[in-house]
Amino acid sequence: MEICRGLGSHLICLLLFLFHSETVGRPSGRKPSKMQAFRIWDVNQKTFYLRNNQLVAGYLQGPNVNLEEKIDVVPIEPHALFLGIHGGKMCLSCVKSGDETRLQLEAVNITDLSKNRKQDKRFAFVRSDSGPTTSFESAACPGWFLCTAMEADQPVSLTNMPDKGVMVTKFYFQEDE
């Protein structure tokens, strides 16, 4: 019994040493995040595309399928991420003005954003997976979720009533190949 406890403590020391060595080798103690492209479409099969500099969701067919916007993602925590389009040059943000909370596209480079800067929190979304679908909640405005309208060709927006069935808040989110 005494031998097992001795072996256990040596094993713990070894693991602590290895784990400490792993994190000391990186400047911030975590792996640098890289941008990845994802396809996104709602549970009603509407994809995102840009119309008049506004992100909308609709049914793209034929030659219009090339209009589909890929979502650029930079993970910042296990379940939080920045979302952008156009190679990360335009980012989705949650903006609150008075009683109004809205989604907007901002001309900001996604790789310049930092989870440690308070002003960048409006660009962060918390990803929640439920089976094959994903929802995105604003980190800056808790309770507000990325959504699409039931009708096609309407702006992608935010809702604080995800369970009312008025807006679609469940998406398929798949890494682009």
From Swiss-Prot:
Q: Which residues are glycosylated?
A: N109
Protein name as it appears in the record: Interleukin-1 receptor antagonist protein
Q: Which cysteines link up through disulfide bonds?
A: C91-C141
Specify whether Secreted is a keyword of the entry: yes
Q: What is the annotated role of this protein in its UniProt record?
A: Anti-inflammatory antagonist of interleukin-1 family of proinflammatory cytokines such as interleukin-1beta/IL1B and interleukin-1alpha/IL1A. Protects from immune dysregulation and uncontrolled systemic inflammation triggered by IL1 for a range of innate stimulatory agents such as pathogens.
Q: Which domain of life is it from?
A: Eukaryota
Query: Which gene name does the record give?
Result: IL1RN
Q: Which InterPro entries match?
A: IL-1_CS (IPR020877), IL-1_fam (IPR000975), IL-1RA/IL-36 (IPR003297), IL1/FGF (IPR008996)
Similarity comment: Belongs to the IL-1 family.
The keyword Phosphoprotein appears for this protein: no
Q: Name one Pfam family in it.
A: IL1
Q: What is its main location?
A: secreted
User: Mind telling me which GO cellular component terms the entry cites?
Assistant: extracellular space
Sorted keywords for this record are: Disulfide bond, Glycoprotein, Secreted, Signal
